[in-house]
């Protein structure tokens, strides 16, 4: 038992030691429960949608606290979340799943440096047929959008090879949320 972890988090949340749980918001109650879990000093911490019900301020505070705790205490944290932007600041390794299948498993740094979003202009009504190395190609108002780990010159070559009538190919690195959408599809 490591009570300091609990009291440190409660202090950051400004929760008084004698404050009744019945008078706390749902977010504060969740944080108290998470503080109690941290106080147990587990080697492996499993959190499923840990930020559910937390307002943005509490969520950010807890993400920062959890990141610092895991690093300073050398703990392993396995977590899931539907708030993807929290994960980008928190994780070292990433697994993106879609309908029970693992699409990608790699260090977050590798994913963020490698995946790019590509856009270009195509004629009205054009429907792309691209190889699987270009994820979820879609056209919205004459803009073809796809994601790929390939470098820009290779994507340009694929577009030409597949006789895509395009102009103005552009690319940008993406954040984790865009990476998730790019790999799983928009909807």
Where does each model-flagged region fall?
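ABC transporter nucleotide-binding domains
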Residues: 1-85, 89-92, 98, 103
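Generic alpha-helical secondary structure signal
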Residues: 4-8, 60, 109, 150-153, ...
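Conserved protein kinase catalytic domain
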Residues: 10, 63, 112, 180-181
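Solvent-exposed, flexible loop/coil residues
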Residues: 25, 56, 112-115, 178-180
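Short, surface-exposed beta-strand/loop "edge" segments at domain boundaries and coil↔beta transitions
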Residues: 45-50, 125-128, 153-156
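ABC transporter nucleotide-binding domain
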Residues: 61-150, 170
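C-terminal coupling/interaction segments
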Residues: 143, 147-187
């Amino acid at each position: 038992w490591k009570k300091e972890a609990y009291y440190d988090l409660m202090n950051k949340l400004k929760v008084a030691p004698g404050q009744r749980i019945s008078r706390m918001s749902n977010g504060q109650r969740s944080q108290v429960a998470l503080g109690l879990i941290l106080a147990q000093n587990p080697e492996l911490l499993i959190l499923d949608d840990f930020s559910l019900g937390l307002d943005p301020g509490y969520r950010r505070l807890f993400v920062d606290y959890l990141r610092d705790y895991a690093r300073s205490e050398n703990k392993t944290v396995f977590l899931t979340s539907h708030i993807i932007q929290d994960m980008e600041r928190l994780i070292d390794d990433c697994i993106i799943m879609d309908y029970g299948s693992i699409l990608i498993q790699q260090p977050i740094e590798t994913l963020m440096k490698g995946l790019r979003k590509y856009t270009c202009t195509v004629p009205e009504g054009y429907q792309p047929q691209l190889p699987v190395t270009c994820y979820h190609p879609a056209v919205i108002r004459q803009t073809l959008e796809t994601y790929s780990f390939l470098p820009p010159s290779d994507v340009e070559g694929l577009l030409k090879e597949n006789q895509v009538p395009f102009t103005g190919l552009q690319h940008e690195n993406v954040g984790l949320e865009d990476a998730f959408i790019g790999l799983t599809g928009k909807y």
